[in-house]
């Protein structure tokens, strides 16, 4: 019987952790395309993300390469505004949201949570083509460090020195500025949500396990310690049972 590929991935990740090998999510800094080893760790690649395994993944890779040429930076040098202004318009919404959800942009240089990346992208993608063009042309000079500052300069009409075409659009941008500063929900990444998103897009949790997202205060032993021979009375472990198998 052919094994489910997602189950194979899950078992590989679980086994790696037992041998103290870190398994990490795909990220733009490393920009690896497929699953593999790098500096004693195992990394998922961009094309291991569900919905990006085929042609869609190739398109994302091409978009990142084009952005590198356009702004003369390596992927690991991108900041969040580079990603929003130059990269996001080159990628379809489904693919970009998948990248945000697995933490592809949540690196040290970009420094954005997964939820914040999703939230600001959904605001940014509603700009008109003319407004996006204005931001693209002005960003190299103004070098905004965040989306709020970019929208602050964009909001005035063209007659007022900004980038909007009319008063109605000015009001829309000002309204979005309010929600950038005052999001209606917490934009930090909840551990259970991270587990859920990685299972959805990578086939299994990678950054955290269901156990790590749970209360483990009553446990005194890990699964690894049991496998290494620990035994005795009053052993308590916290584990996630994914399947039962008879031997």
Predicted segments with their positions:
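Noncatalytic, beta-rich nucleic-acid-contacting surfaces in large DNA/RNA-processing enzymes
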Residues: 1-247
């Amino acid at each position: 019987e052919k094994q489910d590929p997602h189950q194979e991935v899950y078992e590989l990740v679980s086994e790696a952790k037992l041998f103290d090998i870190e398994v990490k999510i795909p990220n733009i800094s490393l920009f690896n395309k497929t699953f593999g080893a790098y500096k004693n760790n195992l990394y998922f690649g961009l094309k291991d993300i569900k919905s990006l395994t085929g042609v869609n993944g190739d398109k994302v890779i091409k978009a990142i390469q084009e952005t590198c040429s356009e702004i003369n930076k390596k992927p690991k040098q991108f900041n969040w505004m580079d990603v929003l202004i130059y990269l996001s318009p080159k990628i379809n919404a489904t693919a970009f949201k998948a990248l945000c959800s697995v933490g592809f942009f949540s690196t040290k240089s970009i420094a954005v949570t997964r939820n914040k990346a999703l939230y600001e992208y959904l605001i940014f993608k509603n700009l008109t083509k003319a407004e996006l063009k204005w931001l693209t042309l002005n960003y190299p000079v103004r070098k905004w460090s965040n989306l709020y500052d970019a929208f602050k300069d964009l909001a005035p009409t063209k007659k007022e020195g900004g980038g909007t075409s009319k008063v109605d659009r000015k009001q829309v941008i000002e309204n979005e500025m309010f929600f950038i500063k005052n999001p209606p929900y917490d934009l930090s990444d909840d551990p259970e949500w991270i587990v859920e998103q990685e299972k959805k897009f990578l086939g299994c949790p990678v950054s955290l396990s269901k156990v790590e997202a749970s209360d483990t205060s009553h446990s005194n032993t890990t699964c690894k310690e049991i496998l290494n021979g620990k035994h005795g009375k009053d052993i308590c472990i916290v584990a996630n049972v994914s399947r039962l198998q008879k031997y």
